[in-house]
Amino acid sequence: MASSSTFLELTPFQWNQPLPYTQRPHHRTVLLYSKPQRRSNSIRLQISVKYKQSTSSSDPDLRSNFNPFEQIAIQVKKALDSLKKPAIAAVLLGLLLFYDPNSALAASGGRIGGNSFSSRSRSSSSSSSQSYSVPRTSNPSFSYSARTAPYYGPSPFGGGFVGPAVGFGFGGFSSFSLILVGFAAFVLVSGFLSDRSQDDSILTDTQKTSVIKLQVGLLGLGRTLQQDFNRLAESSDTSTPEGLSYVLTEATLALLRHPDYCISCYSSVDVKPSIEKGEKRFNQLSIEERGKFDEETLVNVNSIKRQSSKIRKASGFSNEYIVVTILMAAEGIHKLPPINGTTDLKEALLKLGSIPRNKIMAVEVLWTPQNEADALSERELLEDYPLLRPL
């Protein structure tokens, strides 16, 4: 009887003790897999495994401190963290697709200069309408004599004397004299034609127009060059020939002060037969160079000034550059030496800056980038200025 009572006491203990632990994991497992989902299935499987492992532990403190909601929150946070990378990639892709490079990477440009083609064309047309006097030369005088002699002829009226007859002739001229006269006439005509040809050649040389282009590429370290051109554009009077001569002189001096930064160069000289054709070529070169700017942020042309503050920040790399272009139209024929090194560049700048003021018809100085905080990359230098050759 005692044994039976002991059995009855142990049976409830063995039956009731594991009851809360066996029902809870079974109930959790059915709850987790009753509604399967794509993204949360693996997470719930991990929770169930951890729950089973924690319940299999023999430590009562771990079982009492277990919080399934905390584990769920941790797994949800991990899932959100894993979704952040694709979301960031999608955002970056959208920015790249809708990104406008010209909105922030606009290359600024400066332009300063002017021209006096209209006044020169009027003066040349008025001078061409003037008449040129022919030089006087001594002409040989041809002498002639009028001799009267009585003429006797038959008369139907029986009279013998009719009247005096007047005859003209070269007195005492022989064939040798005629040769001398012809030679003198040839000398006279040839001298007259030579004088006219010399006058025509002088007039043609005066009307010829030389259009000069000098382009220099510099390292971006020469930021003081931009400051020089900015001050020149803000203070110069570009509506007078004196002001244009001053701009040309100061531009050549600014390049001469930075020989160590000059790395490439290009030059060309076009001689046109008239002022009109020279003006056309000058305007063509100016528009071509201005088209390489995304925006002209500083302009002073014929004393018409304009300024804009749109710039882009320099990236700070060492491969940033500055390009300066000098365009000039001058009366007559002018030439620049071939440029193969810094010495040749210095000689060309000196010759360009020493052209007389009364010969200058037009000057334009263009530089990019205009702002000191702007940048011109190596790729832009090679694409926009392919004619530059290293010094």
UniProtKB/Swiss-Prot annotation:
Any one GO biological process: nonphotochemical quenching
One Pfam family hit: DUF1517
Membrane topology, record value: Multi-pass membrane protein
Protein keywords: Chloroplast, Membrane, Plastid, Thylakoid, Transit peptide, Transmembrane, Transmembrane helix
Region (Disordered): 116-140
Bilayer-crossing regions: 87-107, 168-188, 321-341
Subcellular location: Plastid, Chloroplast thylakoid membrane; Plastid, Chloroplast membrane; Plastid, Chloroplast envelope
Transit peptide start-stop: 1-48
InterPro entries, A to Z: DUF1517 (IPR010903), FLAP_modulator (IPR053023)
Residue stretches of biased makeup (Low complexity): 116-138
Location (main, coarse): plastid
Disruption phenotype: Normal green leaves under continuous-light conditions. Delayed non-photochemical quenching (NPQ) relaxation during induction of photosynthesis at moderate light intensity. Higher NPQ during the high light period under fluctuating light conditions leading to pale green leaves. The double mutant missing DLDG1 and FLAP1 (dldg1 flap1) has a pale-green phenotype similar to the dldlg1 simple mutant in continuous light, but a lighter pale-green aspect in fluctuating light and higher NPQ than in flap1 single mutant under short-day condition.
Cellular component per GO, a single term: nucleus
Biological role: Monitors proton H(+) homeostasis in chloroplasts to manipulate luminal acidification levels appropriately to balance photoprotection and photochemical processes. Required during acclimation response to fluctuating light (e.g. photosynthetic activity optimization) by controlling non-photochemical quenching (NPQ); acts independently from DLDG1.
Assigned protein family: Belongs to the FLAP family.
Record's protein name: FLUCTUATING-LIGHT-ACCLIMATION protein 1, chloroplastic
Organism: Arabidopsis thaliana (Mouse-ear cress)
Organism ancestry: Eukaryota, Viridiplantae, Streptophyta, Embryophyta, Tracheophyta
